[in-house]
Swiss-Prot record:
Pathway: Amino-acid biosynthesis; S-adenosyl-L-methionine biosynthesis; S-adenosyl-L-methionine from L-methionine: step 1/1. Its cofactor is Mg(2+); K(+). It comes from Alkaliphilus oremlandii (strain OhILAs) (Clostridium oremlandii (strain OhILAs)). The gene is metK. This is S-adenosylmethionine synthase. K(+) binds at E43. ATP binds at H15, D174, G175, K176, R240, F241, D249, R255, K256, A272, K276.
Length: 395
């Protein structure tokens, strides 16, 4: 078998783009708590001393957006000006409008309903936009995710944990991780390279940071059997990372879509998740596609599975569904597609119902990945249809 390297990255909750994702989803959660049927498209931008929240929100409730923004930033850890951002003193600007009436026409009543072709009430709601969404699963890890992104997320989360619990007191919120895994054919065999860039106080030297990162972060997360004497470590390779967060780089909602999904291991339709309610198929259909792919792999129908869904704005049924098993399928892809059509309802209203997507809780996935989260009970991560699929496939 041939050897190859694959690399994925993650970022901590203090990364400027991830700050924006969390703020947008915290606002979404607060609105859904009071008005589950609200339409939300909330975008956030941050720069030095400034937060701008803009978008389209149609709701019957009131939420205090500046208060939510400040609380989210405080929980992330930007509480002092010397960290590069202060939740108490930053400016918060809002520019919120209602959802376009033209878009609402298609979401409120789907094309099938307008033509009198709808079979049930689930076809009364149309997709909130056109677009393509991908879902993926593979058997490289227990959570059925690619190993590079799984390790990158866990390292990033560990960076945050050791900062917040005081294990490494000089750390600050901003940070990034990157993991390169060596494959023998399609099997991951070792970790080739680990990159960690972490914001820190000015008082600490590079040697101390490297020692602490390897001892308290890498060795606590990466299985020892994946590390060897040839594994390379790049810890803060610029030599200094004191200026970070929005002071170092401006941030924007939806700019970490590969981090949010599969780390580049699978395709991506281009749509971001955070700040969007579930009528936006960018989010809900991507979650549904992961749910389908994960159940297919959990059922043993394939070692790898990628699902593509496509929608037209204002139309409830998917325009197309594609199954790709990369030669690992135990049954034909056409047969898998038939099972999907039989056991998964991929109309937006059905996805929202089956996955409980009107419930708040989106901020929990706004950092460290929307998929493969063993630390959270996510409906789209359940494998409750795997046994049924296995039986019907005759495996």
């Amino acid at each position: 078998m041939f050897k190859k390297l694959f690399t994925s990255e993650s970022v901590t909750e203090g990364h400027p783009d991830k700050m924006c994702d969390q703020i947008s989803d915290a606002i979404l959660d607060a609105i859904l708590e009071k008005d589950p049927a609200a339409r939300v498209a909330c975008e956030t931008s941050v720069s030095t001393g400034l937060v701008l929240v803009a978008g389209e929100i149609t709701t019957k409730c009131y939420v205090d957006i500046p208060k939510i923004v400040r609380k989210t930033i405080e929980e992330i850890g930007y509480t002092r000006a010397k960290y590069g951002f202060d939740s108490d003193t930053c400016a918060v600007l809002t520019a919120i409008n209602e959802q376009s009436a033209d878009i609402a026409l298609g979401v409120d009543e789907a094309l099938e309903s307008k033509k009198g072709e709808h079979r049930d009430e689930l076809e009364a709601i149309g997709a909130g936009d056109q677009g393509i969404m991908f879902g993926f699963a593979c058997n490289e890890t227990p959570e059925l995710m690619p190993l590079p992104i799984s390790l990158a997320h866990k390292l990033a989360k560990r960076l945050s944990d050791v900062r917040k619990d005081g294990t490494i007191g000089y750390l600050r919120p901003d940070g990034k991780t990157q993991v390169t895994v060596e494959y023998d054919g399609d099997k991951p065999v070792r970790v080739d390279t680990i990159v960690i860039s972490t914001q820190h106080g000015p008082e600490v030297d590079a040697a101390t940071i490297e020692k602490d990162m390897i001892e308290h972060v890498v060795q606590k997360i990466v299985p020892a059997e994946l590390l060897d004497e040839n594994t390379r470590y790049f810890i803060n390779p610029t030599g200094r990372f004191v200026i970070g967060g929005p002071q170092g780089d401006a941030g924007l909602t939806g700019r970490k879509i590969i981090v949010d999904t599969y780390g580049g291991y699978a395709r991506h339709g281009g749509g971001a998740f955070s700040g969007k309610d579930a009528t936006k198929v960018d989010r809900s259909a991507a979650y549904a596609a992961r749910y389908v792919a994960k159940n297919i792999v959990a059922a043993g129908l394939a070692d790898k599975c990628e699902i593509e869904l496509a929608y037209a704005i204002g139309v409830s049924r998917p325009i197309s569904i594609l199954v790709e098993t990369f030669g690992t399928g135990k049954i034909a892809e056409a047969d898998i597609a038939e099972l999907i059509g039989k056991h998964f309802d991929l109309r937006p209203a059905a996805i929202i119902r089956d996955l409980g997507l009107r419930n708040p809780g989106y901020r929990n996935v706004a950092a460290y990945g929307h998929f493969g989260r063993a630390d959270l009970d996510l409906t789209w991560e359940r494998t409750d249809k795997a046994e049924l699929l296995r039986k019907e496939a005759g495996l």
